[in-house]
Amino acid sequence: MGQKVNPTGFRLGIIKDWTSRWYDDSPVISGKIKEDHVIRNYVQTRLKREKAGIARIIIERTTKHIKINIYAARPGAVVGRKGEEINNLSQELGRITGKEVKIDVVEVVKPEIESQLIGESIAYQLENRVSFRRAMKMAIQQAMRAGAEGVRIRCAGRLGGAEIARAEQYKEGKIPLHTIRANVDYASVTAHTIAGTIGIKVWVYKGEVLNQRIDAIEEEEMKRIKERRSDSGPRSRNDRSQKRRRRPNDRG
């Protein structure tokens, strides 16, 4: 059943981190989760016209302000001339949330191996009546050339305008879904065509990652073992001999 699990959720807390990095134990936590969803949708739709290529959006919160990290293939499109676009975006989000919003833009070095950008590129081509096979094969070739160790793309729906919906997928390299230390980037995108919607799923294997989280967990386990040993203390030879003598009597 490993193939049915979301690869990102399967690795959360080990080699993957949450996209909403804040903590709140108050009853209004549901409102903040909804607010994060609204922020992501607004940023995606707002920057889609600029063709910035948004790979992911990370939201951090404090008591006074909200910090948004936008990972973009074209950061210049997000910032704009003399920072006009980013200032306007922060003001618009400030009016929506009612808090001060700070935006940082991070450039995506290799957009060819970002699953979200691959899915959006294929969706754009399908909406413009490009052959789905051509779009999928081209995306896989570009990702493998850029350094990906494995790519799998699956399209499902009325492919090519067919009356009966079906699913087709192409794969190159390896995609280890059960190996937790394997850095598998996953995304799901929907293409809105004349014939109907087409679901696009993308898996990109970027290699194994031994994160500091794993090392930290191992260090904590070693500390616990040492503490248990120190609490129990070293046993003397007399204690051991007494236990050995007691064994026959206990059995009898």
Swiss-Prot record:
Signal sequence interval, chain numbering: none
SMART domains in the cross-refs: KH
Ranges annotated as biased composition (Basic and acidic residues): 221-241
Domain of life: Bacteria
Any GO BP: translation
Biased composition regions of type Basic residues, renumbered to the chain: 242-252
Pfam families assigned to the protein according to its UniProt record, in alphabetical order: KH_2, Ribosomal_S3_C
Biological function: Binds the lower part of the 30S subunit head. Binds mRNA in the 70S ribosome, positioning it for translation.
Stated name of the protein: Small ribosomal subunit protein uS3
Species of origin: Chlorobium luteolum (strain DSM 273 / BCRC 81028 / 2530)
Gene assigned in the entry: rpsC
